[in-house]
């Protein structure tokens, strides 16, 4: 089990999502995704989980639902899951 660490960008983005009136079902999907990652389990193919390229190559990205993306990093040596940011493709890139 990984310890979860949230970056400031992630905290700001998740608050923005909450203010936008996020549906309970989507909130649960976000929590389930984070729980799966923290448990060390592989995400199902539907999440389109992949490593990013270029300057962001040390991070991974998964599609939580539609255009809602989660950028994260797993530090296996220290057993830490870092939640980097969350949002739409246009918000993140």
PLM segments and residue spans:
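Basic, Lys/Arg-enriched alpha-helical interface segments
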Residues: 1-66, 75-81, 90-93
């Amino acid at each position: 089990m990984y310890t979860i660490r949230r970056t400031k960008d992630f905290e700001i983005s998740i608050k923005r999502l909450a203010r936008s009136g996020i549906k309970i079902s989507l909130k649960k999907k976000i929590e389930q995704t984070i729980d799966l990652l923290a448990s060390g389990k592989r995400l199902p193919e539907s999440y389109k989980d992949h490593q990013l390229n270029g300057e962001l190559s040390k991070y991974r990205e998964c599609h939580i639902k539609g255009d809602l993306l989660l950028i994260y990093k797993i530090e296996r040596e220290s057993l830490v899951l870092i939640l980097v940011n969350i949002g739409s493709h246009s918000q993140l890139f």
